[in-house]
Swiss-Prot record:
NCBIfam families the UniProt entry points to: S18 (TIGR00165)
Annotated compartments: Plastid, Chloroplast
Subunit structure: Part of the 30S ribosomal subunit.
GO annotation terms (biological process): translation
GO cellular component: chloroplast; mitochondrial small ribosomal subunit
Protein name: Small ribosomal subunit protein bS18c
Source species: Buxus microphylla (Littleleaf boxwood)
One function term, GO molecular function aspect: small ribosomal subunit rRNA binding
Keyword Chloroplast (UniProt): yes
Domain of life where this protein originates: Eukaryota
UniProt similarity note: Belongs to the bacterial ribosomal protein bS18 family.
Originating gene: rps18
Amino acid sequence: MDKSKRPFLKSKRSFRRRLPPIGSGDRIDYRNMSLISRFISEQGKILSRRVNRLTLKQQRLITIAIKQARILSSLPFLNNEKQFERTEFTARTTGSRTINLNK
């Protein structure tokens, strides 16, 4: 086979496998906040399995732990900073009457 008809061969690069984000000693539990917080986005959403690089079983356990932590109020449902920037008293006038929004 002459050189012009030979298929292009890529050089083999060394492939380093990434370490799993959850070690064998880590317990997936709703009380382990340092572990759970790694799998939540800035807005408080649960990250997908592809982003987390978890197995199906690990992702299911993480999802259950996050939901338990949210229900027990150790983790917020939403992580929205705009919610806390609101002023203490907001008055809105509509015609002749004033409506107090913070009741």
